[in-house]
Regions:
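ASCE RecA-like P-loop NTPase motor cores
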Residues: 1-236
Length: 236
């Protein structure tokens, strides 16, 4: 309790550095969780590797079931940089394998930071690098609201501008399709798709649904659709 109180007071007083000593494992996680609960601010938790980050992510998800606990690590399952071997005069091209689920979780982390205040992002130290201008990313968000006026062509253009691809056959992550007056969009950061019904250029309904079964889950008065990638720039 003393450590929790002192750490919380230090944060409220804008202390630049604080160190927690004498606690290991889950005890340290619990202590920091109580500090987060006391301070009530968005929090970034950094670990030194992916394995520990995954463990911390699971622990914080259990400790904060109603918060936006997010996971932000490198999405590469495998990465080989460009290289040159002078002995054999061989140039090796860059090669990599990207994990789609990790990419989804990374985008979900940044979208949560723009939507909510109760955010805890668990990351690895290797992810401390720039992702571009957050203001530019935020400006590209598409806001869909019931009874708002929008044409099919305008919504299509907005979606393409934020790197969603049209695919009228298969609805996959980062894709959308158009079925008459209905847009079905699979956000890059969600596990559910949304169905937007537009009639006479007016949004009639916004519904979340399972992209595999088509089962509808919840209706929305409004929905914020975030870009399908982090590196994004102004059209100008």
């Amino acid at each position: 309790p003393t450590a929790i109180s002192e750490l919380s007071d230090g944060l409220k007083e804008n202390a630049s550095h604080q160190t927690l000593l004498g606690v290991t494992g889950s005890g340290k996680t619990y202590t920091i969780a109580k500090v987060i609960e006391e301070v009530q601010k968005p929090t970034l938790v950094i670990s030194h590797n992916k394995t520990l980050a995954a463990q911390l992510y699971g622990e914080f998800k259990n400790l904060f079931p109603n918060n936006a606990v997010e996971y932000f690590i490198s999405y590469y399952d495998y990465y080989q940089p460009e290289s040159y071997m002078p002995v054999t005069d061989t140039f090796i091209e860059k090669d990599f394998s990207m994990n789609e689920e990790i990419d989804r979780l990374r985008l979900k982390a940044t979208s949560s930071l723009l939507q909510r205040k109760d955010v805890i992002v668990v990351s690895s130290v290797s992810c401390i690098y720039g992702l571009g201008n957050p203001n530019e990313w935020k400006k590209q968000v598409v806001h869909l609201k019931l009874d708002d006026s929008i044409s099919r062509s305008s919504l299509t253009e907005y979606l393409v501008d934020i790197y969603y691809q049209r695919n009228d056959q298969v609805l996959e992550r980062c894709n959308f399709r158009i079925l008459g007056d209905i847009f079905e969009i699979f956000p890059a950061y969600e596990d559910k798709a949304i169905r937007v019904d537009i009639f006479d250029n007016i949004i009639q309904s916004i519904v979340s649904f399972d992209p595999l079964t088509g089962e509808e889950h919840s209706e929305h008065d409004e929905f914020y659709l975030y870009p399908a990638r982090h590196f994004i720039s102004d059209k100008d």
